[in-house]
């Protein structure tokens, strides 16, 4: 099961962590407090692990992705660290969060809260107008976030639908438009190389004060969520590429090529559905999968075919080999941007800091990492599966609760899957269930 309470030893250690940045911690760090910096998250997020700064000189964008320096407060093999590794990830259930770290850290000193000095690990990238990172620097920094934004406000400012937000955040508006511009460039560049975008609507379950599900609706990605996604992907790739090239022991996020047999049966199935795809070589490429997804857009059976394509894919996992990410069509990829809620990110922050401080070659650090990382990657992958499953089950329970208030009503939906025992129907609000063959 998923651990719910933190052991006393862990809580005691969390209590001892300072709630503000100490002068000694600032020593030797790059001071970026002068940069115009924002966080952009959901309205109710409390664990803010990433902040953004962006300027442009000539045709070069200077993008700063600033990530909370959690490893400054969670020491290797401390009680806090062992508990975090055991949990592997925070779990976001429909009615609560089961955090990887105690809230005193995750919502306090490790959260990039507005107007507070915070320690960060920053990936500073110079990006040209084609979306290529021409140079980058990873540095230990001190930052101070000017504004805690939420996705909705940024989206409304960019779509010009909220005068009040425009007035309130007037000083930041040029930066938001520049973000939108760079995000579009990065997205195009990823699309060009074959990155696959499955556009499945996620669910947003609305609960009342008593925790009962009162509404279920699709959670839509928008211009603001895409900006953050694009910038995080870029930082993750940039970090992974540097460490893979340097051949330093590391934890990567990898996604293997699909199983050839599954691909064959998928192509046959698609052929029968009237979707004709030729693959050039033995192994299918991300670009070819991308073309399948694009060729079915708007078709009545789009949802069903997208699911079939997704099922032919392997699951992404954490590994110590940098074997690439099929779905992103990326040669290098890692998880660097969420150390408050994912252990692999916290783990690689330690490696990066040891490297920046010149400690890897001394003190046997390289051997130490070579010894522990396979197990960290394995444990993190297992915890991620466990969390995904718990999140799915929790969503299903809340959706069932919501639908139980609508018994006897008629709903229109699309057939999202067919099996020997019936058909799966998905409603516009993302609720999906089986219509059993016996009831047809």
Regions found by a protein language model. Give the residues of each.
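Electropositive polyanion-binding surfaces
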Residues: 2-440
């Amino acid at each position: 099961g998923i651990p719910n309470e933190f052991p006393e030893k862990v809580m005691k250690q969390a209590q001892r962590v300072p709630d503000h940045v100490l002068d000694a911690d600032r020593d030797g760090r790059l001071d970026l407090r002068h940069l115009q910096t924002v966080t952009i998250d959901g309205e109710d997020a409390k664990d803010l692990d990433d902040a953004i700064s962006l300027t442009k000189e000539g045709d070069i964008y200077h993008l700063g992705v600033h990530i909370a320096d959690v490893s400054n407060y969670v020491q290797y093999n401390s009680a806090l660290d062992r508990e975090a590794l055991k949990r592997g990830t925070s779990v976001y259930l429909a009615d609560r969060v089961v955090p990887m770290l105690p809230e005193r850290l995750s919502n306090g000193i490790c959260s990039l809260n507005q107007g507070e000095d915070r320690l960060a690990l920053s990936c500073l990238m110079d990006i040209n107008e084609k979306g290529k990172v021409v140079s980058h620097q990873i540095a230990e920094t001190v930052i101070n976030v000017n504004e805690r934004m939420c996705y909705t406000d940024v989206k409304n400012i960019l779509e010009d639908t909220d005068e009040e937000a425009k007035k309130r955040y007037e000083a930041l508006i040029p930066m938001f438009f520049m973000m939108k511009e760079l995000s579009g460039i990065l997205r195009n560049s990823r699309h060009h190389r074959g990155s696959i975008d499955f556009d499945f609507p996620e669910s947003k379950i609305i609960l009342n004060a008593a925790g009962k599900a009162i509404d279920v609706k699709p959670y839509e990605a928008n211009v603001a969520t895409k900006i953050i996604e694009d910038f995080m992907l870029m930082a993750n790739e940039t970090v992974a590429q540097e460490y893979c090239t340097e051949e330093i022991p590391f934890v990567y996020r990898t996604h293997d090529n699909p199983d050839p047999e599954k691909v064959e049966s998928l192509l046959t199935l698609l052929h029968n559905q009237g979707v004709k795809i030729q693959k050039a070589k033995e192994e299918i490429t991300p670009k070819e999968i991308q073309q399948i997804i694009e060729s079915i857009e708007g078709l009545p059976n789009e949802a069903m075919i997208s699911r079939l394509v997704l099922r032919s894919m392997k699951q992404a996992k954490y590994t110590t080999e940098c074997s690439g990410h099929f779905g992103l069509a990326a040669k290098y990829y890692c998880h660097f941007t969420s150390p408050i809620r994912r252990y692999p990110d916290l783990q690689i922050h330690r490696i990066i800091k040891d490297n920046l401080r010149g400690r890897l070659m001394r003190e046997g650090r390289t051997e130490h990492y070579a010894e522990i990382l396979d197990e960290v990657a394995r444990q993190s992958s297992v915890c991620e599966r466990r969390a995904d499953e718990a999140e799915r089950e929790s969503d299903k329970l809340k959706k069932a609760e919501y639908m139980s208030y609508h018994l006897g009503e008629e709903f229109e939906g699309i057939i999202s899957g067919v099996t020997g025992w019936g058909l799966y129907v998905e409603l516009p609000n993302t609720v999906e269930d089986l219509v059993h063959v016996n009831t047809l």
